[in-house]
Amino acid sequence: MKTMITLLFSALCVATVSAQTDEKDNAMLNNGINFLDIPYVAHTLEVTDGEEELIINCDEVDCTTFVEYTLAMALSPTEDGQVAEGDFATNLQKIRYRDGKINGYPSRLHYIADWVNNGIRNGFLEDVTTAYSPYTQKVSLSYMSSHPELYKQLS
């Protein structure tokens, strides 16, 4: 339960920077609540040894997939309260992969900073950093490329 509350908080944080209307922000919360009874399982995307593909598994989530699914649902049009599967998959791919293009394992956005920047660049997140803090820090992210032996998809 503590994990799901933390995940809900994460979704709310994403909702505050979502470039959508208040109605969409409410959709983030409502979508997140729907995941309360869904088990937390680590590495839910590491299920294939072959070519990178769009994995959708709403029966179990990790920290990242929880937020990705919640945001993809909020960005997708609904009909009779249901999200169209095709729209959901299209939005999920835009969220999860650099510029929405699946081009192998490295095209997946593994670092949250890259994930946020991709969202800002593609218009479904808004950078509110300067509105809340005058302090920013640029970081260089290279752990995965510096340690490829730790990732079977990179070794």
What function would you assign to each model-found segment?
Residues Y40-S155:
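Acidic/His-rich structured neighborhood in mature extracellular/periplasmic domains
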Residues M1-Q20:
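Bacterial Sec-dependent N-terminal signal peptides
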